[in-house]
Amino acid sequence: MAKSLFQKVWDAHTVRKLANGQTQLLIGTHLIHEVTSPQAFGMLRDLGLKVAFPQRTFATVDHIVPTDQVVEPYRDPLAQAMMDELRKNCAEFGITFFDRSTGKQGIVHIVGPEQGITQPGTTIACGDSHTSTHGAFGAIAFGIGTSQVRDVLATQTMALGPLKVRRIEVNGKLRPGVYAKDVILHIIRTLGVNGGTGFAYEYAGEVFDRFSMEERMTVCNMSIEGGARVGYVNPDDTTFTYLKGRPYAPKGAAWDEAVTRWRAVASDSGCRYDDVVKINAADIAPTVTWGINPGQGISINEQIPDPAKATDADEKANIEEALAYMKLQPGAPIKGTKINVAFLGSCTNGRLSDFQEVAKFVKGKRVAAGVKAIAVPGSQIVALQCEKLGLDKILSEAGFEWRAAGCSMCLAMNPDKLIGDQLCASSSNRNFKGRQGSPTGRTILMSPLMVAAAAVTGQVADAREVFGVSAN
């Protein structure tokens, strides 16, 4: 019987079916960070339990670390306390910790892949919403809560309800100036922020076949923003080339055996899906959000929605709420909206290729007067790669502040925060109310190059026009 990758991985990791309809799943890899793990370790101590398989758990610090300070003690005592607590917990329970002193620290969803910890055909859990990033490698990866972090630490298993599988095919060729971020924003806009509830998304088609691993990670990262618990791409030669030689990837004969196994985990031809969505790549334009969830998106040349044209009362109320918070006018073009801050980074777009693309076009240009622009690499390794290529200098000369690795302004748990009702052009993944540190701060999501275009013009702009983009 033909099976999807999701069904194969689910079946291979099923421990038992539970009476409540859930499945007890073996978790192949567990990733932790400083925010959702302290309470879980505390519960282990209270119960007198050990970590069942410490070799399957990997830790890093990312959410609260300051990006403008690397020397300890940190100015923020909470950041220092959380860093110290994670160090203590990892040492006590024998868990590998990618601390800042290792040169391998960074956002957990960037560290896992670059270390070769993220691999096809396994299950991956982490106490973070954007764990679906790892699905780019053909893994079933999902975010979990603190009590589930405890369960995985104690048993290497957790309970999860069944999911349906929706295949999303994007065929054709993307137009110049359209990036992976535009693809996922278009998908979420099309299917809605709740459209994926109860689903795993399988991304496929000619566009994904051509995408690099970093582009696939960008798309899978935001699956949860469309309601999907899981998002994945079938593993192929692009996957294997990326993984080969990385620290935790198999070596020698074990590598050949792994590739054979990984090829077999891909969805079978003729397997059944619960739903199939087909999208023409030519229909995707540079896309930005205008509202207060990632599904409230429009192409750069569209107008801000008018609640008077809503199809029902709920949609009308949602548009009105978003317009009031964002201080935007219905029917006005989104292009030309003034910005105060530009943020490059996050687990969505904080990888080497993101900074390479931006540096290529901002070289010789300057951030507009009155705009604060920061560039935050997703890991220490990404930072080092950028610095070896001189990308940090290009960005700094253009007026961006080059920072140390961390989550930074994506969720603003560290000092990188908006002030008042500042509007930020952001390459991150969420534009919720207050997401970037100020209860009245405003966020517009877009691709890294669109962030750069906004930074140098001081307003939401079409990067194709600003930089003369003719090819990706």
UniProtKB/Swiss-Prot annotation:
Enzyme class: lyase
Cofactor descriptive note: Binds 1 [4Fe-4S] cluster per subunit.
The protein's Enzyme Commission number: 4.2.1.33
Binding site for [4Fe-4S] cluster: C347, C407, C410
Catalysed reactions listed for this entry: (2R,3S)-3-isopropylmalate = (2S)-2-isopropylmalate
Pathway(s) per entry: Amino-acid biosynthesis; L-leucine biosynthesis; L-leucine from 3-methyl-2-oxobutanoate: step 2/4
Cofactor(s) needed by this chain: [4Fe-4S] cluster
PROSITE patterns in the cross-refs: ACONITASE_2
InterPro entries per UniProt: 3-IsopropMal_deHydase_lsu, Acnase/IPM_dHydase_lsu_aba_1/3, Acoase/IPM_deHydtase_lsu_aba, Aconitase_4Fe-4S_BS, Aconitase_4Fe-4S_dom, IPM_dehydratase_rel_enz, IPMI_cat
Subunit structure: Heterodimer of LeuC and LeuD.
Family statement: Belongs to the aconitase/IPM isomerase family. LeuC type 1 subfamily.
Protein name, as recorded: 3-isopropylmalate dehydratase large subunit
